[in-house]
A protein has these predicted regions:
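Sec/Tat signal peptide C-region and signal peptidase I cleavage site
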Residues: 19-25
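Conserved C-terminal helix/tail region of periplasmic/extracytoplasmic solute-binding proteins
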Residues: 300-335
Length: 335
């Protein structure tokens, strides 16, 4: 199966069941929130200590996923009402395919925590990246890692069409790289840490940023849920912002770290090192021009163009401005 057919299959799948979006939890006294394991964030302290339920007055079912593409499908089916830290590329793929989702806040920025790793035995670095031509690579299609992979290969002049690209979740890619089953693997979080044990990156986070490879995740939700439950969503975002502020105060980190690590399924050292590479923009920063005030929308247009030019999606939206809804985040400022 080709890159395009796999990604379009996922997009078509969410489009076919998009009508189910409205069938969210009746009355919303109970909702389901998607998140990632091995992706430690301050919100997990609030998750584990009941802060969300207390603020929202609703029961929350937390379900872990292995990719943002899977999150989109779950929101389309009505099984998930909010996704925390969904990558921008899978979001762009979903809305470009007709799914009515909206970004409601910037969850995290992490240029150093999403990358591709080349098997150490190949002895390939950025000076010899052209030798990757024809190699086998594990990539979670439709994700931030996929976008970064395409941009890096374009930068190095490597024809992706001539590579053997295999769709693998990051954890699977890390295992395949360690076993010598692939020459390169792309991913994030704990899986990326394991990949680095078997190889080396080509570009640092700073070098990727210079190429325009921005890496950030968003909190997303079906537009129907945002319209129906704006107040509930604002309360969710307020708790998230409070948890981020708590983590920013080093005095709180000793009590928060063990809780976050346990929920993320990681040890405390790995959790601390991963969090050190994360940036959690404040509410005011998120609403500024660099993020939801226009920068994110422009970036999504660029992501769509890369996917369109590479044949991974059939069409892009004329504008992605309508896929961002800042009303709930604006409400947080008044809380």
């Amino acid at each position: 199966m080709t890159l395009k057919s796999k990604l379009l299959g996922a997009v078509a799948g969410v489009a076919m069941i998009a009508g189910g979006q409205a069938a969210t939890a009746g009355g919303h006294s109970e909702i389901t929130v998607a998140y990632f394991l091995e992706w430690p964030m301050p919100f997990q302290f609030a998750k584990e200590t009941g802060m969300y339920e207390e603020a929202m007055g609703a029961k929350i079912n937390w379900v872990s996923f292995d990719s943002g593409v899977a999150m989109s499908a779950a929101m389309a089916s009505g099984d998930v009402q909010i996704s925390v830290s969904q990558g921008v590329p899978p979001f762009v793929g979903a809305v470009s395919g007709g799914q009515d989702l909206q970004i409601v806040d910037v969850a995290v920025s992490y240029s150093d925590n999403d990358n591709c790793v080349v098997a150490s035995g190949l002895e390939i670095d950025k000076m010899s990246a052209g030798e990757l031509a024809g190699k086998k690579v594990a990539v979670p299609l439709g994700t931030a890692a996929h976008y970064g992979f395409l941009k890096q290969m374009s930068h190095f002049g490597v024809d992706v069409g001539g590579m053997d690209v295999v769709d693998m979740a990051p954890a699977e890619g890390a295992a395949a790289l360690s076993q010598g089953a692939v020459d390169m693997a792309c991913g994030w979080g704990g899986a990326l840490r394991r990949m680095k044990e078997s190889g080396n990156i080509l570009l640092t986070g700073a070098e990727k940023s210079e190429l325009g490879i921005l890496v950030f995740d968003a909190t997303t939700a079906p537009a129907a849920f945002v319209a129906e439950e704006g107040e509930m969503l604002a309360k969710f975002l307020k708790v998230t912002a409070d948890a981020n502020a708590m983590w920013a105060d080093e005095a709180n980190q000793a009590k928060m770290l063990p809780v976050i690590a346990k929920d993320a399924g990681m040890d405390e050292t790995a959790t601390s090192e991963t969090l050190a590479g994360f940036i959690f923009p404040s509410v005011d920063e998120q609403l500024g021009a660099a993020w939801l005030g226009g920068g994110a929308q422009d970036f999504m247009g660029g992501v769509a163009k890369v996917f369109l030019d590479s044949g991974n999606i059939d069409a892009a939206l004329d504008s992605y401005a309508g896929t961002v809804n800042t009303a709930p985040l604006m409400a947080v400022k008044g809380m």
